[in-house]
Amino acid sequence: MAEERRNRWGGVAAPLVGAAVGFAVGAIVGGGMLPRIYDWTTEWNIDAPRAEVFRILSAPEEQRHWWPSMIVERVEPLPDNPDGRIITYRVLQAPSVRRVAPPFILVSTIGDVDRDRRTRAVVTGDLAGVLETLLYDRPDGGTRIVYHWYTRVTNPLLNALGFVMAPVFRASHDHVMREGEAGLQAYCAARLGQRSVPATDIETRQAGS
């Protein structure tokens, strides 16, 4: 069934991409295209204390263990800000979209940090805007994370694809965020000894989802 859906998608993907490329070229040659604006909110619920969740979210060197679609390419310190950093990501689309939409680059400059509670990042690269991450205690001792994305697309091809494939791009975003929530949940559980889940098992399970 999954293979049949992929084949059906493959049959319509090429015309859509062709239309998007033509749209992008025409817009660029003809005088420009309004950028796509994305204003999305995502909520995660993690069964781990807020301080531990914040620590993991602030450790890009650990991210490959629990969020394989958000590939950390480079980490740089932020001058004059010991809590800040500049992280370059290569972001993979959902598997159903990867054949038509290439990975995109995000450069996240995290300069506003309220330890254990909040971070605010200025995003550049193929998207430009702001990502705010808020952490809250749950009554049961877990953590609620709220991501606020407000970005515009700067990559002309991705911008054009966004006009003709908006529902697909939203589904891809939701897939990547669900992967992150599930991966972080499993990673925290393993670290806290709630159950033994090796990092390689987390990555394998997510890759097959």
Predicted regions and their residues:
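A short acidic/glycine-rich loop-to-helix N-cap element
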Residues: 152-176
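Hydrophobic ligand-binding cavity/cleft-lining segments
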Residues: 11-83, 208
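Charged, low-complexity N-terminal segments of organelle-associated membrane proteins
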Residues: 1, 117-120, 169
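Glycine-rich portal/gate segments that line the openings of hydrophobic small-molecule binding cavities
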Residues: 10, 14-18, 65, 74-130, ...
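N-terminal Lys/Arg-rich, disordered targeting/topogenic segments
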Residues: 1-8
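Short amphipathic alpha-helical segments
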Residues: 49-55, 172, 176, 180
